[in-house]
Design a protein with these regions (language model features):
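C-terminal capping/lid region of NAD(P)-dependent oxidoreductase domains
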Residues: 2-8, 301-308, 316-340
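A short N-terminal beta-strand-loop micro-motif at the entrance of redox/enzyme domains
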Residues: 2-3, 15-46
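Glycine-rich beta-strand-centered segment in the early N-terminal region that forms part
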Residues: 33-50, 58-102
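Short, well-ordered loop/turn sites that connect or cap secondary structure elements
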Residues: 89-90, 147, 238
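Short helix-loop-beta connector
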Residues: 120-123, 146-152, 216-219
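Mid-domain Rossmann-like dinucleotide-binding core that forms the NAD(H)/NADP(H) cofactor-binding site
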Residues: 127-205
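Glycine-rich phosphate-binding loop and adjacent beta-alpha segment
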Residues: 191, 229-302, 335-340
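Short amphipathic alpha-helix with an adjacent loop that forms part of the alpha/beta core around
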Residues: 206-217
Length: 340
């Protein structure tokens, strides 16, 4: 089977953003949908994940991942549906996950795709609670934080795709969980739906005092997603032998120059463990997490929330929104609907 006279829309990097990215930093281009060669698979993108790490890929310098080049399709995790397959492992109509980027259609090698058989969760969940964000939470909590019953566990960006799972896992371990989120509505959801013991609004006039009130016995575990003032408030209240999982620093992703770091002298005296991690260093965690989490989602005991925008053209504004904390839950772009 071949595809003819059909167009693919892609969003490519037009220029490197200075500060918060905008639609002007990207360009929508069209070309003819290519036909897959033997061993390749043509997919139609249904869902696109928008994640904070994308901002780092827009910088010229390389970090833990290769920078996106000018004119290159923007990166991103996707859920797609197979249109044409030259790989016997996939059939037309199959649902697949992959990092196929900001485009309506893509050609992939079979090894770049993972087949998804949705059960008790919608397809979109495989980009959030059952995907990379969920696996990130699982790895950081189980490998670094290792919460124990009765300990105080704090997570920043608590209403986000990662933070919401982090807190629920810590609660399952018996910890007292305090979230930090932006706004009363997010804190209400964190406590009322996710079951956190308390939540602090990071916009509070005296964040350090509010956090101290929520954590009267100090902080034993901290899952870091934000940095900045939140980190400063938490670090001053860490207990001896506290563990800190450094997952992200979203407050400074748009900065042209990173601000100076905190004075870490207390780490020695309090014997604090601070460890950065990247979930893609642990590919086995994705399989473990999905097997563990799918039944929890199906039975409703692992809660999540999605913030959905329709249309690929909204991806640049969505990226700016997540970096500014304007999303509420896992941010997704619905690129197309499933074929019947």
């Amino acid at each position: 089977m071949t595809v003819t006279n059909a167009l693919r829309r892609s969003i490519v990097l037009r220029r490197r953003p200075k500060g918060e990215p905008s639609a002007a930093d990207f360009e929508i281009v069209e070309d003819t949908i290519p036909n897959p060669a033997p061993g390749e698979v043509l997919t139609r993108t249904l869902w696109l994940s928008i994640d904070p790490y994308m901002r780092g890929r827009l910088r010229e310098e390389q970090t833990y991942a290769v920078a996106i080049q000018i004119g290159e399709v923007m990166t991103g995790e996707t859920i797609g549906q197979v249109m044409v397959s030259g790989d016997p492992r996939f059939q037309a109509g199959d649902f697949v996950a992959g990092a196929r980027g900001w485009q309506t259609h893509s050609i992939s090698k079979g090894d770049q795709l993972t087949k998804i058989t949705p059960g008790g969760a919608p397809l979109s969940a495989y980009l959030g609670v059952l995907g990379m964000p969920g696996a990130t939470a699982y790895a950081g909590v189980t490998e670094i934080c290792k919460p124990k019953a009765g300990e105080t566990f704090v997570v920043s960006a608590a209403s986000g795709a990662v933070g919401s799972v982090v807190g629920q896992l810590a609660k399952r371990a018996g910890a007292r969980v305090v979230g930090v989120a932006g706004g009363a509505d997010k804190c209400l959801w964190v406590q009322g739906t996710l079951g956190f013991d308390d939540c602090v609004d990071h916009r509070a006039l005296d964040l350090e005092r509010e956090l101290r009130t929520a954590c009267p016995n100090g902080i034993d575990c901290y899952f870091e997603n934000v940095g900045g003032a939140v980190q400063q408030a938490v670090f001053g209240q860490l207990n001896p032998f506290a563990r800190v999982a450094m997952c992200g620093m979203i407050s400074q992703y748009n900065e042209q120059e990173f601000p100076p770091g905190p004075n870490l002298g207390f780490v020695v005296g309090k014997r604090v463990l601070i460890q950065g991690f990247i979930v893609t260093d642990r590919p086995e965690r994705f399989t473990e997490w999905r097997a563990m989490a799918e039944p929890l989602v199906a039975e409703g005991s692992l809660a999540y929330r999605e913030d959905v925008l329709d249309g690929l053209e909204n991806a640049p504004d969505a990226l700016a929104g997540i970096l500014g904390g304007r999303n509420f839950g896992k941010l997704l772009i619905r690129v197309a609907h499933e074929a019947g």
